[in-house]
Amino acid sequence: MDVEKDVLDVYIKNLENQIGNKRYFLKQAQGAIDEITKRSLDTEGKPVNSEVFTELLRKPMFFSERADPIGFSLTSNFLSLRAQSSSEWLSLMNDQSVDQKAMLLLQNNINSDLKELLRKLQHQMTIMDSKKQDHAHIRTRKARNKELWDSLADFLKGYLVPNLDDNDESIDSLTNEVMLLMKRLIEHDLNLTLNDFSSKTIPIYRLLLRANIITVIEGSTNPGTKYIKLIDFNETSLT
């Protein structure tokens, strides 16, 4: 143990001497540079002796020591730090119990799912763009549905119902009655029968029948009952 300490002390002492020497040489070199710079300023305009300059370049400016303890020390310190950081990283990786192959497989599956999702979204966007109509004021299907119901109510109250009014009942009351019948038709109320049309709304029944947009079906359990049903516009031609 004492031998190792003695060797270490000698090494440290040698290293300190080398550092001191390098500082001395650097100081001497800096002084020489300053002197040359000063002389060049004082002798500005005089020609430089090329032979003297060539002779100077033939001589080595610096001889590095063969042992170079400073270089060895820096290299040793760098390698020690690298070894320590590598050891810490390997220790951290060894502590993790995650299977690397499973992680890669999971990532590949996620990437595949994301790619498929993106493809479907792009396809859906293409379909939506092809069917897009210029209805910027309508934001949702619910808003569109409300707009259609409101349009139907306006049509009934402003055009159709006034032609049915016999002055015995207000337009608003008759409009509500007709609107209820139309709503039951549109929502495919299976219990809607001819008896649900009053004497004031029976003209609506005749109008729809002449337009071929309703069907009248005789009840199977009650032959005297006539059920009224709206036609399927996707399958029936109105011509």
UniProtKB/Swiss-Prot annotation:
Database matches in CDD domains: MCM22_CTD (cd22646)
What keywords sit in the KW lines? Cell cycle, Cell division, Centromere, Chromosome, Kinetochore, Meiosis, Mitosis, Nucleus
Further comment: Present with 1026 molecules/cell in log phase SD medium.
- What superkingdom heads the lineage? Eukaryota
Function of the protein = Component of the kinetochore, a multiprotein complex that assembles on centromeric DNA and attaches chromosomes to spindle microtubules, mediating chromosome segregation and sister chromatid segregation during meiosis and mitosis. Component of the inner kinetochore constitutive centromere-associated network (CCAN), which serves as a structural platform for outer kinetochore assembly.
**Hey, which family's this protein in?**
Belongs to the CENP-K/MCM22 family.
UniProt subunit comment: Component of the heterotrimeric kinetochore subcomplex CTF3, which consists of CTF3, MCM16 and MCM22. The CTF3 subcomplex is part of a larger constitutive centromere-associated network (CCAN) (also known as central kinetochore CTF19 complex in yeast), which is composed of at least AME1, CHL4, CNN1, CTF3, CTF19, IML3, MCM16, MCM21, MCM22, MHF1, MHF2, MIF2, NKP1, NKP2, OKP1 and WIP1. Interacts with CTF19.
Q: Where in the cell is it found?
A: Nucleus; Chromosome, Centromere, Kinetochore
Disulfide bonding pattern of the chain: none
- GO annotations under biological process? attachment of spindle microtubules to kinetochore; cell division; chromosome segregation; establishment of mitotic sister chromatid cohesion; meiotic cell cycle
Do the record's keywords include Cell division? Answer: yes
Has UniProt tagged this entry with the keyword Cell cycle?
yes
**Gene Ontology CC annotations of this record:** kinetochore; nucleus
| Name of this chain's protein | Inner kinetochore subunit MCM22
